[in-house]
């Protein structure tokens, strides 16, 4: 059996981890294993391939179950554990591995992220702490087109978050890497670009300023900050070159071509360890070691053979890496380059060496820009228009000047002399100053892309195949049909009789979108925090991804968990009208008696009263949206006293099909008279799973269910969509209907929301 065939079986067996709605049980896995063993004895190649694929499928499922074990068993109760610190920001965020539990070693260790508290003494990677822990299963917000933090955490082997109740250090010594990093940080303090130097050299990106990260994102150069294939392969190449040069001084019988190869891989492994062996670096080392073994075999391997074997080795070592977007981006980049150079090789023009190098770089960057477009849109929901020019400057500068200078300085830092080290750091710092001067000179190039452009982004692949096969002459009908299919989503128009309500998963806040005919109105804008807000992080990219243009905002009240994203949204769309009960400048009133039409829908305000002196939650603007058949009552954070006042006069006008649960399901709201008077079918609650108030309240939830409501909340369902049409209404949620995946489930204690 060929090794590439085994690689295909590995990839095929583990790929279902990406799409399974839930993991099979133990009995199912036992049956599959037995069935695969039976198939293996059938002397037919295809059957044996199926058997091998089934065995790798079982291996992938067992690996996923192993990671989820901690989240399913350690939550709820206090745990006595020994934690080895793997990374820290030196303040309140610490990454660790639980190595011992209740006095017993556990294997493999479970990843843990601790937030919000300082440890009793100075902390660094490599220390071991005895802790009394209160841990939680990882749980992330889930929105269509948003960052999937829960999937990311599982791919990083970090199924737990939590806090420590008590902590005492057992092993106070830092790891050698941490000591070396601390020494570098002290040395680099005088240099303006020290944070970027540490990011490039040691993989320490926590201290890189947000402004720098935004520049690199907007110019499509953020990939240079990851310790990945580019850096590690260059370290291996540099080490192999030095070893090969040293062989000149050896006797002929000691010179073997394998020695530079093995030495380069060993040096690359040391560098990967020095940078913290982060997942991208670890995957690169697995791929590099696989390539080295293929090379040592003495056989000729094609680019596709190497690609299959490397990807298979990575997935065999770590099956849940299939969830990692960085792995998919790296694998797609390599596959795109193999395809590009096979189907569109660089022209062999007679040029001077310098010009030929420039042409080769332009050819490479053109291929990677065009062919990676589909993956970039799927992962980042946008592209950088300046990435082509930016990478023409950044890749050669960073690869051939900055990184070698940093690597040399890191070596000289251990041995001296000091004057040479300072010179190397200075040159590396100045090269970065030149790089970011160039990047800052470029116009803002990042644009958010709507989902409907996804298929058209495959056009470079399609056109390249058509051109190379001369298909536009031999198969013109198929070429036209293929082009039309890629453009089909762009021609689709929203049905005029349909409109949608979206409840976004913004955590402990509220953001709802009413959409019709490509236009939208927002009811509240989520939260704000010191580093950002829901508008910038979620709502704006979400609107772009769904090709919706907002025309107005309704603010229920002034609390920050409801208006947090407003400023960011107004920065992008400054002409939006705003309705609120706040009497702020440029705000239209949202008080009892106000009514308006929008896209054929009738909006009517039912609370507060004109001239009301209420403040805070009880001053929330209650709005009813009605299409003549179905309706929604949006209530903000209104509480029981205001509910009673509203119902005492206007109870006949609040009946609705759907009710947005007031105040995130708090006991202070959702009085029984309100629930009964609305007489709705569905209750929609927005909250975070882990909130200090344990909302939504189980008592409130049961109250709605006893009155015949279907209960929907964002912790369990994620983003929720309600589609209204002439045929009625249909509700769907991201976790359960639209994107059901095993890694999106509610892990840990089933009823814990605090």
Spans of model-derived segments:
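Membrane-interface helix/helix-cap signal primarily in integral membrane proteins
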Residues: 54-223, 533, 537-541, 545-549, ...
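Hydrophobic alpha-helical segments
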Residues: 1-19, 294, 407-422, 426-433
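Hydrophobic alpha-helical transmembrane segments in multi-pass membrane proteins
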Residues: 5, 47-50, 162, 212-388, ...
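N-terminal leader/targeting segments
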Residues: 1-77, 161-164, 176, 283-284, ...
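Aromatic-rich juxtamembrane segments at the membrane interface
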Residues: 155-287, 292-293, 422, 596, ...
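Residue-level signal for inorganic ion chemistry
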Residues: 13, 83, 326, 372, ...
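Alpha-helical transmembrane segments of polytopic membrane proteins
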Residues: 24-35, 329-330, 391-399, 452-456
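Non-globular, low-confidence helical/coil segments that flank catalytic cores
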Residues: 118-132, 152, 168, 266, ...
């Amino acid at each position: 059996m060929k090794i590439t065939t085994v690689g295909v079986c590995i990839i095929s067996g583990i790929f279902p981890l990406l799409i399974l709605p839930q993991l099979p049980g133990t009995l199912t896995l036992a049956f599959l294993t037995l069935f695969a063993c039976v198939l293996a004895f059938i002397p037919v190649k295809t059957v044996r391939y199926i058997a091998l694929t089934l065995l790798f499928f079982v291996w992938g499922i067992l690996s996923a179950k192993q990671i989820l074990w901690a989240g399913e068993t350690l939550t709820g109760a206090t745990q006595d554990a020994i934690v080895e610190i793997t990374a820290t920001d030196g303040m309140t965020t610490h990454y660790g591995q639980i190595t011992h539990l209740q006095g017993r070693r556990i294997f493999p260790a479970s990843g843990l992220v601790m937030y919000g508290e300082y440890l009793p003494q100075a902390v660094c990677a490599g220390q071991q702490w005895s802790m009394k822990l209160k841990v939680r299963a990882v749980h992330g917000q889930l929105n269509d087109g948003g960052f999937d933090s829960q999937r990311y955490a599982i791919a990083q082997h970090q199924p737990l978050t939590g806090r420590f109740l008590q902590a005492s250090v057992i092993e106070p010594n830092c790891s050698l890497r941490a000591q070396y990093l601390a020494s570098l940080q002290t040395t680099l303090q005088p240099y303006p670009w020290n944070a970027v130097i540490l990011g490039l050299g040691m993989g320490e990106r926590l201290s890189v300023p947000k402004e720098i990260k935004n520049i690199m994102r907007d110019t499509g150069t953020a990939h240079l900050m990851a310790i990945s294939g580019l850096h590690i392969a260059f370290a291996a190449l540099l080490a192999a070159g030095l070893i090969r040069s040293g062989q000149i001084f050896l006797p002929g019988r000691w010179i073997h071509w394998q020695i530079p190869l093995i030495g380069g891989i060993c040096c690359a492994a040391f560098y990967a360890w020095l940078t913290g062996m982060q997942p991208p670096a670890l995957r690169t080392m697995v791929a590099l070691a696989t390539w080295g073994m293929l090379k040592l075999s003495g056989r000729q391997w094609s680019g596709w053979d190497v690609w299959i074997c490397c990807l298979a080795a990575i997935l065999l070592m770590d099956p849940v890496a299939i969830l990692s977007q960085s792995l998919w981006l790296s694998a797609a980049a390599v596959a795109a380059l193999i395809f590009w150079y096979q189907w569109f090789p660089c022209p062999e023009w007679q040029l001077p060496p310098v010009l030929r190098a420039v042409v080769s770089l332009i050819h490479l960057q053109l291929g990677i820009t065009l062919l990676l477009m589909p993956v970039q849109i799927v992962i980042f929901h946008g592209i950088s228009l300046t990435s082509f020019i930016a990478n023409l400057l950044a890749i050669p500068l960073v690869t051939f000047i900055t990184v070698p200078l940093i690597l040399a300085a890191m070596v000289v830092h251990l041995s001296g002399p000091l004057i040479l080290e300072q010179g190397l750091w200075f040159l590396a710092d100045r090269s970065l100053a030149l790089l970011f001067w160039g990047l800052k000179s470029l116009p803002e190039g990042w644009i958010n892309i709507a989902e409907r452009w996804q298929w058209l982004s495959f056009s470079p692949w399609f056109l390249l195949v058509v051109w190379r096969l001369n298909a536009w002459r031999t198969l013109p009908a198929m070429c036209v049909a293929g082009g039309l299919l890629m453009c089909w989503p762009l021609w689709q128009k929203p049905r005029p009789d349909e409109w949608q309500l979206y409840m976004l998963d913004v955590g402990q806040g509220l953001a709802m979108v009413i959409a019709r005919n490509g236009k939208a109105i927002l009811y509240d804008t989520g939260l704000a925090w010191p580093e950002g807000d829901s508008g910038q992080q979620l709502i704006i990219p979400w609107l772009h991804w769904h090709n919706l243009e907002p025309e107005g905002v309704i603010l229920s009240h002034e609390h920050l968990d409801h208006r947090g994203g407003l400023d960011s949204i107004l920065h992008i769309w400054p002409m939006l009208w705003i309705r609120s009960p706040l009497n702020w400048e440029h705000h239209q009133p949202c008080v009892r008696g106000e009514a308006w039409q929008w896209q054929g829908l009738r909006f009517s305000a039912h609370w507060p009263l004109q001239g009301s002196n209420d403040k805070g939650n009880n001053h929330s603007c209650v709005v009813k949206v009605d299409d003549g058949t179905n309706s929604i009552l949006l209530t903000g954070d209104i509480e029981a006293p205001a509910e009673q006042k509203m119902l005492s006069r206007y109870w006949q006008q609040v009946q609705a099909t759907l009710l947005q649960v007031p105040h995130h399901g708090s006991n202070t709201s959702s009085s029984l008279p309100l629930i009964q008077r609305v007489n709705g079918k569905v209750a929609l609650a927005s909250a975070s799973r882990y909130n200090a108030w344990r909302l939504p309240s189980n008592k409130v939830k049961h109250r709605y269910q006893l009155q015949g409501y279907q209960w929907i909340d964002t912790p369990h369902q994620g983003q929720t969509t309600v589609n209204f049409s002439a045929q009625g209404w249909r509700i769907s949620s991201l976790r359960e209907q639209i994107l059901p995946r095993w890694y999106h489930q509610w892990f840990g204690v089933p009823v814990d929301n605090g």
